């Protein structure tokens, strides 16, 4: 293999996204739709509310009857009926008459305001019910009007939106007993390395337990994919080639961990060559994860992630995550970006774009990013408490505590559109290459 020439993070992501395709959709019962992605726009097929209704318990009245009401001269209304949620009051409501109304009930035709129960005094006289008010009300006071929440034809949630409890409520409101959701892509996972032990194996000299597999399994599930794990394989070319070839026919995308460096036992580039796959890139100007390699074969993406845990983690979030989200129709496939204060000095120069694992906290409305412990690509411990990446653009000389930095959120379902054009060099006006 010839000398590897690094490309920028932005260029690498752009190349990958050129092969990120939308997937299929399926119908699920509404009770199973939470946590999935909408496969169609959610459009209101009627107004919400579909009638003028009361948001409070109280009395429906004609507002003009209260024009002269005051604390000294309260206005008395005869209570001529009662209406509960789900019921109608069809009788005429005349001057200085009121209808006792419950939260959610439809406003009677002759009424145009609601007096909250706690603003009234109620009493009975000669077998009739009365209530009095000590202030005036305007037409429309305390009424939820038809369509004020949503008008018929309004797009309430876009295709590709994450179905949270609020969207679940909308789906029920508009009668979706079955919900069109994005079908989960099948993501194949294959680990390579003769040094890998199973989780339940005893440690041996020179060996490590296969932690990357379970990390990636969790990342795939977090972003919404379905995992097909093919196992771990020793550093043998023919064995790995056969495993990769067989796996490709069963998945929508394939991830391999390990085998992407330049050592004698790193076979992945040669495997891509024998398969006839087109390598999109094999080196990225970033730390960690510079040897991340991505290829495509007949439009299907093959992600070669580093065997180092942190490099593997970063590679997944930058390159695999957006492809999975795009497959599920998301227009915000990338990690969400925010600004945060740096909680600790990071004075090391950054010749390449650097993604530092971080714990993001919020103090009185201000996000603060604290680097997570030991910062080497082989580190596992720093990943456990990380919920963000601090992004340090290439060409910067380091950052001091309390400087503003960009952070990418890991535990987030909103995502963002293309974000790599936002970065600028410190206080200068020149764009940074990322």
Predicted feature locations:
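Flexible glycine/proline-rich
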Residues: 28-31, 35, 40, 86, ...
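Generic N-terminal segment detector
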Residues: 1-22, 395, 406-413, 417-421
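Intrinsically disordered, low-complexity, positively charged segments
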Residues: 6-68
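Conserved active-site and cofactor/substrate-binding residues in soluble primary-metabolism enzymes
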Residues: 4-11, 25-28, 32, 56, ...
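Short, glycine/charged-enriched hinge/interface segments at domain edges or termini
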Residues: 2-4, 9, 60-229, 373, ...
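Helix-rich terminal scaffold detector
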Residues: 1-10, 177-305, 309-315, 429-434
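Residue-level signal for inorganic ion chemistry
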Residues: 16, 58, 153, 189, ...
């Amino acid at each position: 293999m010839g000398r590897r020439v690094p490309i920028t993070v932005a260029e690498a992501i752009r190349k990958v996204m050129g092969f990120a395709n939308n997937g299929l959709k399926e119908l699920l019962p509404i009770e199973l739709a939470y946590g999935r992605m909408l496969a169609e726009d959610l459009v209101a097929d009627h107004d919400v509310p579909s009638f003028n209704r009361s948001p409070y318990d109280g009395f429906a009245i004609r507002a003009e009857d209260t024009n002269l009401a005051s604390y000294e001269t309260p206005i008395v209304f005869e209570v001529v009926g009662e209406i509960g949620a789900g019921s109608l009051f069809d009788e005429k409501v005349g001057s200085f008459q009121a209808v006792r109304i419950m939260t959610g009930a439809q406003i009677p035709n002759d009424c145009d305001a609601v007096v909250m129960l706690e603003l009234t005094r109620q009493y009975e006289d000669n077998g009739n019910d009365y209530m009095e008010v000590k202030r005036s009300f305007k037409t429309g006071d305390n009424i939820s009007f038809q369509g004020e929440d949503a008008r018929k034809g309004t797009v309430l949630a876009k295709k590709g939106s994450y179905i949270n409890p609020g969207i679940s409520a909308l789906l029920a409101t508009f009668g979706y007993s079955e919900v069109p959701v994005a079908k989960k892509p099948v993501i194949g996972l294959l680990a390579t390395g003769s040094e890998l032990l199973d989780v339940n194996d005893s440690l041996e000299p020179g060996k490590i337990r296969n932690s990357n597999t379970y990390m990636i399994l969790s990342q795939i599930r977090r972003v919404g994919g379905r995992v097909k794990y093919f196992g771990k394989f020793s550093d043998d070319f023919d064995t790995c080639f056969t495993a990769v070839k067989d796996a490709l026919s069963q998945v929508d995308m394939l991830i391999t961990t390990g085998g992407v460096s330049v050592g004698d036992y790193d076979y992945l580039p040669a495997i891509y060559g024998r398969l006839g796959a087109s390598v999109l890139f094999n080196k990225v100007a970033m730390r960690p994860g510079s040897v991340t390699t991505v290829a495509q074969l007949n439009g299907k993406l093959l992600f070669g992630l580093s065997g180092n845990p942190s490099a593997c983690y970063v590679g997944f979030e930058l390159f695999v995550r957006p492809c999975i989200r795009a497959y599920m129709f998301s227009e915000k496939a990338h990690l969400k970006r925010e600004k945060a204060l740096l909680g600790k000095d990071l004075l090391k120069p950054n010749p390449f774009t650097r993604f530092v694992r971080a714990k993001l906290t919020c103090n009185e409305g201000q996000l603060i990013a604290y680097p997570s412990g030991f910062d080497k690509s082989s580190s596992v411990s720093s990943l456990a408490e990380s919920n963000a990446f601090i992004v340090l653009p290439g060409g910067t000389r380091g950052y001091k505590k309390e400087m503003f930095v960009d952070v990418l959120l890991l535990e987030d379902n909103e995502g963002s559109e293309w974000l790599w054009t936002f970065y600028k060099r410190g206080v200068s006006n020149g764009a940074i290459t990322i």
